[in-house]
């Protein structure tokens, strides 16, 4: 996966070629794991992933940073926050919640629903990606004359976390209004 992409980027400079101008890759808000501080910041510690998915996203960030440092490849990681919209992933909570409501089954909610999620519409994700693509991290040297890795990480979300119980209530109301539920 990402290792092969990074290797391709590295070798794009072979034989005096111009090479990759800017690698932009998808990461995830899942890297924040059990962090309690809200809002999340890219400066927050993300060393304790709570899933294999989060661990792979964090390892991708570490590899991209290493390649930026070792090979001076401009790279930017984008931590997406719960993306929704047309053609959304069927494993996302809102699809699962909708299916459970349609089947008359109970939705299992942890922590009494006292958690918040930042839902981000896919068009906003696309806008963020396009903006970042146009602005690669600058290649520059530090005071010691050595290159500073041209590497950045950004959070891409809507900056308005929703309470999970409120989300389920609104989902149910909208499904009733749309006559999907009785």
What are these regions (language model features)?
Residues 3-7, 91, 123-126, 130:
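Conserved active-site region of classical short-chain dehydrogenase/reductase
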Residues 38-39, 90-98:
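A glycine/serine/threonine-rich, flexible loop-to-helix segment
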Residues 1-83, 162-165, 169:
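N-terminal Rossmann-like NAD(P)+-binding domain of SDR-like oxidoreductases, especially those catalyzing
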Residues 18, 47, 89, 101-102, ...:
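A generic fold-level signal
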Residues 52, 87-90:
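Short, solvent-exposed loop/turn segments at secondary-structure boundaries
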Residues 6, 65, 98-99, 130:
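Solvent-exposed, non-membrane alpha-helical residues enriched in polar/charged side chains
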Residues 99-182:
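C-terminal substrate-binding subdomain of Rossmann-fold SDR/epimerase-dehydratase oxidoreductases
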């Amino acid at each position: 996966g990402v290792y092969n992409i990074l290797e391709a980027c590295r070798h794009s400079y072979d034989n005096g070629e111009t090479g990759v101008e800017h690698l932009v890759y998808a990461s995830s808000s899942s890297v924040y794991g059990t962090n309690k501080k809200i809002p999340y910041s890219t400066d927050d510690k993300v060393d304790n992933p709570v899933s294999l998915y989060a661990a792979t996203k964090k390892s991708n960030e570490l590899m991209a940073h290493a390649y930026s440092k070792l090979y001076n490849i401009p790279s930017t990681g984008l931590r997406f926050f719960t993306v929704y919209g047309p053609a959304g992933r069927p494993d996302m909570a809102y699809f699962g919640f909708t299916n459970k409501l349609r089947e008359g089954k109970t939705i299992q909610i942890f922590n009494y629903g006292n958690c918040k999620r930042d839902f981000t519409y896919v068009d906003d994700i696309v806008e963020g990606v396009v903006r970042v693509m146009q602005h690669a991290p600058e290649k520059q040297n530090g005071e010691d004359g050595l290159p500073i890795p041209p590497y950045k990480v950004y959070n891409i979300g809507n900056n308005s976390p929703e309470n999970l119980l409120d989300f389920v209530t609104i989902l149910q109301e909208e499904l009733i209004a749309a006559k999907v539920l009785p």
